[in-house]
Amino acid sequence: MRDDRALNVTSEIGRLKTVLLHRPGEEIENLTPDLLDRLLFDDIPYLKVAREEHDAFAQTLREAGVEVLYLEVLAAEAIETSDEVKQQFISEFIDEAGVESERLKEALIEYFNSFSDNKAMVDKMMAGVRKEELKDYHRESLYDQVNNVYPFVCDPMPNLYFTRDPFATIGHGITLNHMRTDTRNRETIFAKYIFRHHPRFEGKDIPFWFNRNDKTSLEGGDELILSKEILAVGISQRTDSASVEKLAKKLLYYPDTSFKTVLAFKIPVSRAFMHLDTVFTQVDYDKFTVHPGIVGPLEVYALTKDPENDGQLLVTEEVDTLENILKKYLDRDIKLIKCGGGDEIIAAREQWNDGSNTLAIAPGEVVVYSRNYVTNEILEKEGIKLHVIPSSELSRGRGGPRCMSMPLIREDL
């Protein structure tokens, strides 16, 4: 790893040095039962306790020597670089919020510019803006009157504490993702401005392996770095096969890349298998925690550079068990640790609460949710060091420690 690189992630388990989180905010308080489907939530977390749990997560990482950065802070700092950048950010945010009324757009621009502190403005954008919060808002136009019942001008963004999905660090670059749903695709604007304008990243020659303007979808929960040469990507409920090809072309043909193969895993299209990392994460050099439903046989496609056609890919289909695929490409014996010990009922329960979604902070050392006690006991018996965090409220969003974190720098193995 070069010391001057702002980003460096070449594995899932290298010692974690810097991570990006989002502390749950008022967007959680703006969830109501009627909005759950629209905002992709199954339940309403209790914000006070969710914050306490998230703070415990962040403190666990700090005590392990990890630098913890926050999405909301970096976004606010990024737009402080110039008023032109700030106004562009505000305008783009409003457009992507789906605001069609010109009067509402003007009112929102005035409202956001009324904040003297950029951090408070960003927090408000994330939390959502109610119509009643806009100064002198009157329902005079046809648009305003027809849409009078819905309370928000800009929807809240409760999924933001899952920082894994809007972008993903791969090597010394990122995929700035196009999310499957409009609700979540709005989240990627923060990463766009952070990596283009924040002093920490501006001018650092960060390659973008994928861009949020692409029309096909890619989400960070489907991107797992198996080694400095192999990237695994799930073809899932949230990630398209076309996106995997676009990513592979840019990554494999980049002049300074170490990656040689992209493995595309076709996984079931269902809520329980939403992303690859909900059913499969690495915990040590040779150990992975998995949902029993993904052990295979699986359809896996190996994407490599085509030696006879520059700029093109060779795609090779393989049908085999997960263990055999990993053994072949990592060139070592593999131990799969089944969520819930393989028990059908326990596995389903703990999988629902992300028992297979762990965050490695070093080889053989991971962060896990307390509620998945059966899987946790099995991990400990396999020699894995656990950092157990409280999880009664955070888990209501259906994401675990890996979902809630985006590594920016890991030590190379």
Swiss-Prot record:
It is found in: Cytoplasm. Keywords: Arginine metabolism, Cytoplasm, Hydrolase. GO terms for biological process: arginine catabolic process to ornithine; arginine deiminase pathway. Coiled coil: none annotated. It catalyses: L-arginine + H2O = L-citrulline + NH4(+). GO terms for cellular component: cytoplasm. Pathway: Amino-acid degradation; L-arginine degradation via ADI pathway; carbamoyl phosphate from L-arginine: step 1/2. Its main location: cytoplasm. Its EC number is 3.5.3.6. It holds the Pfam family ADI. GO terms for molecular function: arginine deiminase activity. The active site is at C403 (amidino-cysteine intermediate). Gene3D superfamilies: Arginine deiminase, L-arginine/glycine Amidinotransferase, Chain A. Belongs to the arginine deiminase family. NCBIfam families: arcA, PRK01388.1. HAMAP family: Arg_deiminase. This is Arginine deiminase. It comes from Clostridium perfringens (strain ATCC 13124 / DSM 756 / JCM 1290 / NCIMB 6125 / NCTC 8237 / Type A).
